[in-house]
Amino acid sequence: MYNDDRSYIYNKAFYEAFFNLEHNPKPTALNSARFDLIRSWAAERGIYDNGNSHTQYVKLMEEAGELAQALLKNDKPEIQDAIGDMVVVLTNLAYQENFQIEDCIDSAYAEIATRTGKMVNGTFVKTESL
């Protein structure tokens, strides 16, 4: 959740875009409109015109580092914030590579939907890799 103590590059805009009840009466419902809001927000700020997928990748790694730190501290608000930030960055990176994040998610799910395997040391390992 955004607050004055946690001010990262995307947080306030993310909070305002997704938790503004005038625009999103159901803030917990995930749908394509949320990704459209991210893309509109990014376009308005020149991220697509002046940035590129390489800089978005660097931003993604920064956010991954913040997630790692939050996980180590078991800081639930920061974990949520970092995951949200990563979704924003991934949405932008996908768009810059001429993909829609929704299609990327659908493609990934189609690949794993029938995957079999087992848990090994806390990680799911697909059968082909065992």
Residue ranges of predicted features:
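Flexible "arm" and connector segments at domain edges
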Residues: 2-83, 87-130
